[in-house]
């Protein structure tokens, strides 16, 4: 377990595996179980994935937030992949042959809802953990893409809002290539034609569609899908920078999930400067 860097000189950002610190890993699992209302958070992937985790040194080393990650090439098993995403999506031959070896999967993320500094949550992980990770893997393993899933939980969003969010991202970034959902919740036609009123007549221009969606959700007193928007904003809403795949339903977490693939070279200069910091401890990722 190695320190990557610090966030605001208060949160310590580490990269670790289960075997590095079983005690801390146990605390992480308790936080995840509490955040997602699970009896047990540990799963079959925890022995192979790494965790980037933020620790509050001023609060008795309280776990604040974290992200799970792995290089797809390290999870390849013949024609299969031991990846969380692979549970929900089948990989096309194009993805397996031309993308997988250059792709970093970001697994589940979490924030300790009881932590004193939870407001820094995933931002601290992105700025001081994932940014350095992406820099390192780009330089040392020729990584070009980020693969993951973004969730919309039923206890946070009503179904109408979920469909509106999925439609907006599908209209702007949707593709049926590369990843094929094993059990899709919607067809492309269903996503494209869903409409509740004229406010949801998305044009495919991300910036204007983002305004429409945000206004629609605000009127319904529903939260903005921050993580969804963050990935799109990283590439300034460019279609060449982000691909979204047909949604699936996660019955364990009771949420709809949409897979995505982000092209690292399309991250905007402003966001590169903000997140992809070059000052960090590279030994944390060796």
What function would you assign to each model-found segment?
Residues 2-64, 68:
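Short amphipathic alpha-helix that is part of the acyltransferase structural core
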Residues 40-44, 51, 90-97, 247-249:
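Catalytic micro-motifs at enzyme active sites that drive phosphoryl/nucleotidyl and oxygen chemistry
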Residues 44-53, 76-78, 239-242, 251-258:
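A short helix-loop-beta-strand connector motif used in the catalytic cores of GNAT acetyltransferases and
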Residues 49-51, 64-66, 101-106, 143, ...:
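Extracellular structured ligand-interaction cores
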Residues 62-82:
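Carboxylate/His-rich catalytic cores and anion/metal-binding grooves
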Residues 75-236:
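Acyl-donor binding region in acyl/amide transferases
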Residues 125-126, 130, 228-229, 235-277:
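C-terminal/domain-terminus segments
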Residues 278-286:
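Short, cationic low-complexity segments
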């Amino acid at each position: 377990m190695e320190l990557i860097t610090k966030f605001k000189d208060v949160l310590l950002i580490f990269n670790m595996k289960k075997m590095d610190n079983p005690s801390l890993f146990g605390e992480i699992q308790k936080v995840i179980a509490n955040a997602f209302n699970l009896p047990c958070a540990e799963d079959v992937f925890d022995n192979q994935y790494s965790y980037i985790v933020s620790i509050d040194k001023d609060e008795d080393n309280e776990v604040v937030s974290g992200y799970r990650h792995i290089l797809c090439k390290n999870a390849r098993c013949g024609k299969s992949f031991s990846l969380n995403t692979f549970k929900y999506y089948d990989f096309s031959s194009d993805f397996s042959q031309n993308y997988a070896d250059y792709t970093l999967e970001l697994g589940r993320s979490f924030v300790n809802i009881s932590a004193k500094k939870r407001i820094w949550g995933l931002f601290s992980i992105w700025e001081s953990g994932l940014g350095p990770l992406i820099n390192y893997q780009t330089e040392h393993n020729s990584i070009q893409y980020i693969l993951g899933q973004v969730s919309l939980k039923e206890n946070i969003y009503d179904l109408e809002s979920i469909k509106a969010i999925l439609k907006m991202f599908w209209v702007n970034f949707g593709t049926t290539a590369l990843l094929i959902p094993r059990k899709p919740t919607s067809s492309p036609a269903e996503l494209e034609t869903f409409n509740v009123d004229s406010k949801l007549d998305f044009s495919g221009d991300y910036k204007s569609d983002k305004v429409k969606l945000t206004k629609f959700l605000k009127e319904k007193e529903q939260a903005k899908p921050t993580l969804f928007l963050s990935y799109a904003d990283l590439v300034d809403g460019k279609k060449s920078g982000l691909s979204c795949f047909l949604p699936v339903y996660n019955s364990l977490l009771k949420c709809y999930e949409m897979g995505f693939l982000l092209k690292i070279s399309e991250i905007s200069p402003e966001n590169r400067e903000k997140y992809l910091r070059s000052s960090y401890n590279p030994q944390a990722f060796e």
